[in-house]
A protein has these predicted regions:
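Membrane-helix exit/interface motif
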Residues: 67-70, 96
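Short glycine-/small-residue motifs
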Residues: 62-65, 134-135
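Core segments of cupin and vicinal oxygen chelate
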Residues: 19-63
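Vicinal oxygen chelate
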Residues: 7, 13-21, 54-58, 75-182, ...
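A short, acidic/glycine-rich surface segment
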Residues: 49, 71-76
Length: 182
């Protein structure tokens, strides 16, 4: 099928590049608040007046930020429009989401607190330039040989059968049990 062919081609997200302001704003937030190591910088090869910062997400992928020392942070919320990005989500561990919540609170960053989404916990906040960020942490481990997506796909089918609003713990537990029997 087309979807299974796509999963063979697309390994995972390579990187996200954001438009930033000055270098220090980006380093202070991405490294010092979220804990993503600042790994290097170089000129933006498409615009030599702009710098390009690289931060390690910890899994081999990066967040990169274009910076310009002539720009200052504008903390206004970005517009939520058709064709725009609503938010960027990072998959983190349960301990990381809790540490991040503490770091955000300790440094004056407004956030939602950790929200229970049924199959995962989420923490939402805005980075210094207004982009909505989500830290997402699954509350289950898939059986060996299966992915989180496999479990969620099966759990969704069970949720539909229950005529439920969203996937809950019982759907995840039943989905894992069903996958283990395959």
């Amino acid at each position: 099928t087309k979807s299974s062919a796509a999963s063979e081609v697309y390994k995972r997200q390579h990187h996200i590049t954001l438009n930033g302001a000055d270098k220090n704003t980006s380093i202070d937030f991405w490294q010092n608040i979220l804990g993503m190591k600042f790994i290097f910088e170089q000129p933006n090869l498409d615009d030599l007046n702009t710098n390009h910062l690289y931060f390690d997400c910890g899994d081999g992928t990066t967040v990169t930020v274009f910076t310009n020392e002539n720009l200052t942070p504008d903390k206004n919320k970005l517009k939520n429009e058709c064709g725009g990005v609503h938010h960027v989500a990072f998959w983190v561990s349960q301990s990381t989401i809790r540490i991040a919540e503490k770091n955000l609170n300790d440094n004056g960053f407004a956030n939602t607190g950790i929200k229970d989404r049924g199959f995962m916990d989420s923490l939402y906040f805005r980075e210094p330039l207004g982009l909505l960020i989500e830290l997402a942490s699954y509350k289950f481990d898939p059986p060996i040989g299966f992915t989180h997506a496999n479990v969620l796909e099966e759990a969704h089918k069970l949720r539909i059968k229950r005529n439920a609003l969203n996937i809950q713990d019982e759907d995840i537990a039943s989905a894992i049990k069903k996958l283990r029997q395959k």
